[in-house]
């Protein structure tokens, strides 16, 4: 077996990249309001707003009749069978509505019918080629 002489490759030179200047550490600050602050942990109500303004659950805000109405309306669909029936009826209604209105608006070919008259006789297309 003969030894194959391989050429000696020179040492690889590392790819040189241009040097980038070192970045300076910069302190980010926003000029907003007093003392140049966006967010003040010491004064949360003025920072985020007063959320307690909307959290009123007293009877004078929601009268008893309104609460009774929503309780009765949601009591009907609180059972699993009732909820499934509601979903099934809604799906059927959506399909029927699409069949009556949506298919015509989409100009589906099945709603238009045939656009051209066909040839009369047996195998008319084959005979016309002969």
Curated annotation (Swiss-Prot):
It is a single-pass membrane protein. The gene is PSAH. GO terms for cellular component: chloroplast thylakoid membrane; photosystem I reaction center. This is Photosystem I reaction center subunit VI, chloroplastic. Belongs to the psaH family. Keywords: Chloroplast, Membrane, Photosynthesis, Photosystem I, Plastid, Thylakoid, Transit peptide, Transmembrane, Transmembrane helix. The chain crosses the membrane at residues 85-103. Its main location: plastid.
């Amino acid at each position: 077996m003969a030894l194959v002489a391989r050429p000696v490759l020179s040492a690889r030179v590392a790819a040189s990249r241009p040097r980038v200047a070192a970045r300076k550490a910069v302190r980010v600050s926003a000029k907003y309001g007093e003392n140049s602050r966006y967010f003040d942990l010491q004064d949360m109500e003025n920072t985020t707003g007063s959320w307690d303004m909307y959290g009123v659950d007293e009877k004078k805000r929601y009268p008893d009749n309104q609460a009774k109405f929503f309780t009765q309306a949601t009591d009907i669909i609180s059972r699993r069978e009732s909820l499934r029936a509601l979903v099934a009826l809604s799906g059927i209604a959506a399909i029927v509505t699409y069949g009556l209105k949506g298919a015509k608006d989409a100009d589906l070919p099945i709603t238009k019918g045939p656009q051209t008259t066909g040839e009369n006789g047996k195998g008319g297309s084959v005979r016309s080629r002969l």
